[in-house]
């Protein structure tokens, strides 16, 4: 009888121990489930952060592409401005050459006019000298008349030459006026071109400043991309670690659940054994 009591006490103690272990296993399973849920929540949070970082990276890359496109446009504008400046310089050079040729033609026409005027003056003086002498000699008069006719002929020729020179001079003066007008227009154009050059210079300086700013922004974007890439790698590493932790916790939960099932089966076996023992005692 004492042996039965001892056996019953031992079985009861083993039952209590089994219950304690079962409760402990259940608590450990609950704790493991909580840790697993927490790890899953952290993994979801990390996944959201990774998505946000990827979105930030996409936006930064898009901004960098826009900055590069604007920089290309500014380079094209700078090249166009340089081409315009070169064309304007060529036009100024052509205007200056045209003005020099007009001045040369004017100087030539003025010299020819002076020569014609001098010849006409000499003929007129000779005619007046011959008329003032009043020679009685007919032959001398004839000679003088012939000389006069010749002088008149020369004067007429000189007049014709003078008229021709005057006409050419008028043409030259007209050309000169047009040249002066072109020169004035050229000077105005030069002033306009100088103003355009000044504006272009300011634009070039502005473009250089914009290019420097764009380069600085590009460096900042590169640094941001580098930082975001580092953060992305770190987040991926944390996500992988969290995933491994979840898998490890899931294995621990499975193990504890298996152990709990085993303890429950063991507890059921002890209960069945106690029932059989009580039945035997009652039968005795």
UniProtKB/Swiss-Prot annotation:
Gene Ontology biological process: regulation of muscle contraction
PROSITE patterns membership: TROPOMYOSIN
Signal peptide range: none
GO MF annotations in UniProt: protein homodimerization activity
Ranges in coiled-coil conformation: 1-266
Pfam families: Tropomyosin
Tissues where this protein is expressed: Expressed in striated skeletal muscle (at protein level).
Record remark: domains: The molecule is in a coiled coil structure that is formed by 2 polypeptide chains. The sequence exhibits a prominent seven-residues periodicity.
Subunit annotation: Homodimer.
Similarity field: Belongs to the tropomyosin family.
Primary role: Tropomyosin, in association with the troponin complex, plays a central role in the calcium dependent regulation of muscle contraction.
Stated name of the protein: Tropomyosin Per a 7.0102
Organism: Periplaneta americana
């Amino acid at each position: 009888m004492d042996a039965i009591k001892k056996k019953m006490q031992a079985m009861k103690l083993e039952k209590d121990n089994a219950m304690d272990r079962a409760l402990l296993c259940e608590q450990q399973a609950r704790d493991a489930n909580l840790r697993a849920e927490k790890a899953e929540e952290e993994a979801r949070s990390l996944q959201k952060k990774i998505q946000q970082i990827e979105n930030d990276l996409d936006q930064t890359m898009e901004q960098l592409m826009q900055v590069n496109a604007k920089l290309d446009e500014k380079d094209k504008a700078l090249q166009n401005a340089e081409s315009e400046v070169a064309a304007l310089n060529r036009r100024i050079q052509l205007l200056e050459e045209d003005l020099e040729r007009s001045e040369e033609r004017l100087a030539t026409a003025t010299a020819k006019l002076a020569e014609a005027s001098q010849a006409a003056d000499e003929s007129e003086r000779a005619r007046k000298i011959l008329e003032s002498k009043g020679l009685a000699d007919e032959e001398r008069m004839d000679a003088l008349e012939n000389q006069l006719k010749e002088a008149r002929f020369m004067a007429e020729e000189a007049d014709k030459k003078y008229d021709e020179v005057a006409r050419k001079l008028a043409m030259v003066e007209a050309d000169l006026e047009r040249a002066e007008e072109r020169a004035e227009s050229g000077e105005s154009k030069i002033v306009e071109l100088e103003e355009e050059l000044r504006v272009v210079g300011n634009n070039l300086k502005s473009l250089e400043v914009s290019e420097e700013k764009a380069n600085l922004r590009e460096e900042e974007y590169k640094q941001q991309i580098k930082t975001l890439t580092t953060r992305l790698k770190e987040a991926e590493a944390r996500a992988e670690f969290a995933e491994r932790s979840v898998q490890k916790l899931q294995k621990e939960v499975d193990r504890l659940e298996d152990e709990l099932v085993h303890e429950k089966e063991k507890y059921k076996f002890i209960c069945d054994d106690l029932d059989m023992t009580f039945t035997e005692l009652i039968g005795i």
